[in-house]
């Protein structure tokens, strides 16, 4: 699929859920937990899925496991929404080889490539890293700027430089409203700007962004859908009221390191997504109690 074709598909995807990875007690992936979870997400207005991203605990998934997840979710979704595969690492060569492998699958719509972590590259190094990935296959690339996790930030002007590459079609921007506004104002026509911060979904959409790549949409998809509908209709006050209502719930989902809180909530709702792989650990009983109370309030 060409970059232009993927962009057209993503223009319909305002709420993209970064899918969790369910685990069994022995730490193996619980593929049996995916069908109900995925079907309920699509029913509550998830319009695209990120597979093997941060919320999926990608640092503790092997590439073989990621490929198994891609195949499983593709079979469940059957083309109903775009599938975006996490393909980025802090090793450019590894990322290049993996995106080549993912591109051959034929059913992945785009690759999500995170800023290289730990290495602390310069802006030129960041540019060359993403350029190498984008040039490695025909699979379009979404940049993933999340300095809170990886320390190094893709500065806005570097994103604009990367946006000139034909195969770089969007950004998941996990910084500030100032950066969102600057990017939305200055990116080339057709380049899509998503916030990766659930609490900034209202701001991103009202500024003219595409939408949100979300953790909270596991449980708040309907609310995001209604908020975006109000914005589209010009009813900003009504949209803001929804934002104010859901913000405490969103904050609860990030009160300890994600994805522990969303897994706590999903398990409480009967989705059997299990625990986390070390070095991440589950919420304590007290943390879980507070999170669930806030979500159910």
UniProtKB/Swiss-Prot annotation:
Site note Part of a proton relay during catalysis applies to 54, 118
List, alphabetically, the GO terms of the cellular component aspect.
Answer: cytosol
Against Gene3D superfamilies, the record matches this protein to:
Aldolase class I
GO BP terms, alphabetized? diaminopimelate biosynthetic process; lysine biosynthetic process via diaminopimelate
Indicate the residues that form the catalytic site.
144, 172
Reactions the enzyme catalyzes: L-aspartate 4-semialdehyde + pyruvate = (2S,4S)-4-hydroxy-2,3,4,5-tetrahydrodipicolinate + H2O + H(+)
Q: In which pathway does it act?
A: Amino-acid biosynthesis; L-lysine biosynthesis via DAP pathway; (S)-tetrahydrodipicolinate from L-aspartate: step 3/4
Give the EC number(s) under which this enzyme is classified.
4.3.3.7
Recorded hits in SMART domains, A to Z, give: DHDPS (SM01130)
**Keyword Cytoplasm, does the record have it?**
yes
Any one GO MF annotation of this record: 4-hydroxy-tetrahydrodipicolinate synthase activity
Against PROSITE patterns, the record matches this protein to: DHDPS_2
User: Would the keyword Amino-acid biosynthesis be found if you checked this record's keyword annotation?
Assistant: yes
**Entry-linked NCBIfam families:** dapA (TIGR00674)
Job description of the protein: Catalyzes the condensation of (S)-aspartate-beta-semialdehyde [(S)-ASA] and pyruvate to 4-hydroxy-tetrahydrodipicolinate (HTPA).
**Subunit info?**
Homotetramer; dimer of dimers.
What's the name of the protein? Answer: 4-hydroxy-tetrahydrodipicolinate synthase
Species this protein is from: Lactococcus lactis subsp. cremoris (strain SK11)
């Amino acid at each position: 699929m060409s970059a232009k074709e993927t962009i057209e598909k993503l223009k319909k995807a305002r709420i993209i859920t970064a899918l969790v990875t369910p685990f069994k007690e022995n730490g193996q992936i619980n593929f049996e937990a995916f069908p109900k979870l995925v079907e309920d997400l699509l029913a509550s207005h998830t319009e695209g899925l990120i597979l093997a991203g941060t919320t999926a605990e990608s640092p503790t998934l092997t590439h073989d496991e990621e490929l198994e997840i891609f195949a499983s979710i593709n079979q469940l979704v059957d083309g109903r929404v775009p599938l975006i595969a996490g393909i980025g690492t802090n090793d450019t060569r590894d990322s290049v080889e993996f995106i080549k492998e993912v591109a051959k699958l034929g059913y992945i719509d785009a690759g999500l490539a995170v800023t290289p972590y730990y290495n602390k590259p310069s802006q030129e190094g960041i540019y060359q890293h993403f350029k190498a990935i984008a040039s490695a296959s025909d699979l379009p690339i979404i940049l993933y700027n999340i300095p809170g996790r990886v320390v190094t930030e893709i500065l806005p002007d570097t994103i604009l430089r990367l946006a000139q590459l034909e195969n770089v079609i969007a950004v998941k921007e996990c910084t500030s409203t100032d950066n969102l506004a600057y990017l939305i104002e200055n990116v080339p026509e057709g380049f899509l700007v998503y916030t990766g911060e659930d609490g900034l979904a209202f701001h991103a959409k009202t500024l003219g962004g595409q939408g949100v790549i979300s953790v909270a949409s596991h449980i708040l998809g309907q609310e995001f859908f209604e908020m975006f509908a109000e914005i589209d209709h010009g009813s900003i006050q009504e949209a803001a009221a929804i934002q104010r209502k859901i913000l405490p719930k969103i904050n609860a989902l990030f009160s300890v390191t994600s994805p522990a809180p969303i897994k706590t909530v999903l398990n409480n709702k009967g989705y059997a997504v299990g625990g986390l792989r070390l070095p991440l650990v589950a919420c304590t009983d007290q943390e879980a109690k507070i999170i669930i109370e806030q979500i159910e309030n």
